[in-house]
UniProtKB/Swiss-Prot annotation:
NCBIfam families the record matches: ndhI, NuoI, PRK05888.1-3
Coiled-coil segments on the chain, per record: none
Gene Ontology terms for molecular function: 4 iron, 4 sulfur cluster binding; iron ion binding; NADH dehydrogenase (ubiquinone) activity; quinone binding
Entry binding sites for [4Fe-4S] cluster 2: 74, 104, 107, 110
Organism whose genome encodes this protein: Citrus sinensis (Sweet orange)
Protein name per its UniProtKB record: NAD(P)H-quinone oxidoreductase subunit I, chloroplastic
Cofactor: [4Fe-4S] cluster
Catalytically driven reaction(s): a plastoquinone + NADH + (n+1) H(+)(in) = a plastoquinol + NAD(+) + n H(+)(out); a plastoquinone + NADPH + (n+1) H(+)(in) = a plastoquinol + NADP(+) + n H(+)(out)
Amino acid sequence: MFPMVTGFMNYGQQTIRAARYIGQSFMITLSQANRLPVTIQYPYEKLIPSERFRGRIHFEFDKCIACEVCVRVCPIDLPVVDWKFETDIRKKRLLNYSIDFGICIFCGNCVEYCPTNCLSMTEEYELATYDRHELNYNQIALGRLPMSVIDDFTIRTVLNSPQRKNV
């Protein structure tokens, strides 16, 4: 008869322990319920990238001296620099500059080591296309500045959202 009594005591202790664990997890869930959501509705709301964000590369054709430092410091030898040596002025003349963003790892070495600062990182991160060949940007596509996220009236940033203003 004693094993039966100890079995009921163990069952009672296990039931109390299970109820306590359920109560603790329920309290944790309730404490998280009154927080603001961390996720955003991406196509309609966008986060503002930080200052050091490494997005699409912006290229200024007039500043480039065709030194090819960007190609040498790139871990995957990505930038394609076509130039012609002008014998009368004894300088290189840049003909074409292109970067394939389908292969680029956005390390920022080309921007950091460029002696004339003709390369810079923008805050543009939406580079999705249906064809991977459209990710090969030449000097014309690299020279366009991206439209700012804040200027687009169809997109609300997290700082400008109506939910944020009410709180």
